[in-house]
Amino acid sequence: MVSQQQIEAIGGVLNNKERPLKERFRALFTLKNIGGGAAIEAISKAFDDDSALLKHELAYCLGQMQDAQALDILTKVLKDTTQEPMVRHEAAEAMGAIGHPDVLPILEEYKQDPVVEVAETCAIALDRVRWLQSGQKVDDSNPYASVDPSPPTAGDKSVTELKAIYLDAQQSLFDRYRAMFSLRNLRTEESVLAIAEGLKDSSALFRHEVAFVLGQLQEPCSIPFLQENLEDRLENEMVRHECAEALGAIATEDCIQILNRYAEDDKRVVKESCVIALDMCEYENSPEFQYADGLAKLDATK
């Protein structure tokens, strides 16, 4: 059992702007794994930080915790137009991940947001909550511990059939996401390469989710596609950030070289993402037991 004192100490690391960002990230993921009201409170305090990357990750973790106690802070962040688009988008996605019907009116309102990534995210989150309410069941063979923005497509479809839905801009983003998660769950080279084609889509939100999924898959065949979007300085920084973190998860020598080249990028979100991704590379290539090592570090300081 983790004590209140331990949670406060880990929250202290997360909220200490003097600590390296990679340490604060590890503290955040430790709090996510601990869960509960005290961890949510500690995470919520960091939304006044000046790092959009960190705040976006706070919202992501609150969504993955699937605890309705986080809905108030997430609603506040979504409504706050002084927050960066990637932070507001992640707050909306987190509300969809928690899936409580109380979020429907606020998501409906912000589905018309002038920031396209926020509006699109609210539309997908609405579809997810309504899908949950419908009581439909789907064989979700998600091999990852993530709460996804949509369930996979129902029924057994081939890669060709799924790819046709996935790349069809006339389909709703929710249905395209469903096809993407079905392709991900197949975990074949053919399905990974089909997913990688989505990095050319016209929607920045879609491209960023594609990069996230490629990071989950950790397949080296996707490296050239992720590299191309990361290196494109005209690409949306939310997408470049997600490409960097995906390369960090794949963690080959090539990935490390690419990330080192962009660790001093003039876009802060990209630069910080490369730093975090290099820390992830270090973890993936080390005998370390756990990335979210905040508790172990606390014990080591005793």
Swiss-Prot record:
The keyword Metal-binding applies. Its main location: endoplasmic reticulum. The keyword Iron applies. Pfam families: HEAT_2 (PF13646). One of its GO terms (biological process) is peptidyl-lysine modification to peptidyl-hypusine. It is a peripheral membrane protein. It catalyses: [eIF5A protein]-deoxyhypusine + AH2 + O2 = [eIF5A protein]-hypusine + A + H2O. One of its GO terms (cellular component) is endoplasmic reticulum membrane. Fe cation 1 binds at residues 56-57, 89-90. One of its GO terms (molecular function) is deoxyhypusine monooxygenase activity. Pathway: Protein modification; eIF5A hypusination. SMART domains: EZ_HEAT (SM00567). Keywords: Endoplasmic reticulum, Hypusine biosynthesis, Iron, Membrane, Metal-binding, Monooxygenase, Oxidoreductase, Repeat. It is found in: Endoplasmic reticulum membrane. InterPro entries: ARM-like, ARM-type_fold, Deoxyhypusine_hydroxylase, PBS_lyase_HEAT. Catalyzes the hydroxylation of the N(6)-(4-aminobutyl)-L-lysine intermediate to form hypusine, an essential post-translational modification only found in mature eIF-5A factor. Essential for organismal viability and plays a role in a wide number of important processes such as cell growth and proliferation, and regulates induction of autophagy and protein synthesis. Has a role in eIF-5A-mediated translational control. Belongs to the deoxyhypusine hydroxylase family. This is Deoxyhypusine hydroxylase. The lineage of its organism: Eukaryota, Metazoa, Ecdysozoa, Arthropoda, Hexapoda. The gene is nero.
